[in-house]
């Protein structure tokens, strides 16, 4: 089947499949693919139960370009609070800003895997701060006895920043102003 999400006409659903594999334990399994503008996909992720299930990790994100979504849901009819989500967003040259105070990621390529327990990035590539960037890592559930200093989000960014790129990243405040007098580039991790 195919269709669209209510209120998200730019997102086109395809390969939609719903099934109940076992009638004695009523769990609806839903699989679907979607394609459309990244801003609509981000809005869907933050305004639907997907936002809560993924810890609202993209609540402030903005973006441009088209993206693909693959979605797998497991919905126990008798207790929807126990629902499971798994999916991926494929980016192919998009622009993304995670929060208003972070630099834009341009020409973003890669796959963001997500589930009800977190998300992961593997070899995601972009342009940021005037140079190439590679991102790996993600967010995972912490053990109940984890120290308060341990973060659920662990990302590794490796790239090159240029003086011009830092100058243009006005959301970085003082660093951007200091870069007005700089030249060249430097690697970072």
Question: Where does each model-flagged region fall?
Answer:
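Extended amphipathic, helix-rich lipid-handling scaffolds
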Residues: 1, 23-80, 84, 88-92, ...
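Surface loops and adjacent helix of pleckstrin homology
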Residues: 2, 16, 23, 101, ...
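Solvent-exposed loop/turn segments connecting transmembrane beta-strands
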Residues: 8-10, 99-102, 128-132
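Short "repeat-start/strand-capping" segments in structured domains, especially the N-termini
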Residues: 25, 105-107
């Amino acid at each position: 089947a195919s269709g669209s999400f209510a209120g998200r006409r730019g997102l086109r659903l395809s390969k939609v499949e719903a099934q109940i594999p076992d009638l004695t334990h009523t769990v609806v399994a839903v699989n679907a693919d979607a394609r459309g503008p990244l801003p609509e996909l981000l809005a869907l992720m933050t305004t639907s139960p997907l936002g809560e299930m993924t810890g609202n990790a993209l609540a402030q994100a903005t973006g441009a370009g088209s993206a693909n979504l693959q979605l797998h849901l497991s919905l126990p009819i008798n207790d929807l609070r126990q629902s499971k989500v798994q999916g991926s967003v494929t980016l192919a040259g998009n622009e993304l800003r995670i929060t208003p105070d972070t630099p834009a990621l341009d020409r973003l390529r890669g796959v963001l895997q997500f589930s009800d327990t977190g998300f992961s990035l593997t070899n995601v590539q972009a342009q940021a701060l005037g140079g190439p960037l590679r991102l790996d890592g993600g967010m995972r559930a912490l053990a109940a006895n984890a120290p308060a200093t341990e973060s659920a989000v662990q990302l590794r960014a490796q790239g090159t920043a240029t003086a011009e790129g830092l100058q243009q990243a006005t959301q970085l405040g003082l660093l951007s102003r200091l870069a007005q007098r700089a030249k060249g580039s430097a690697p970072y991790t």
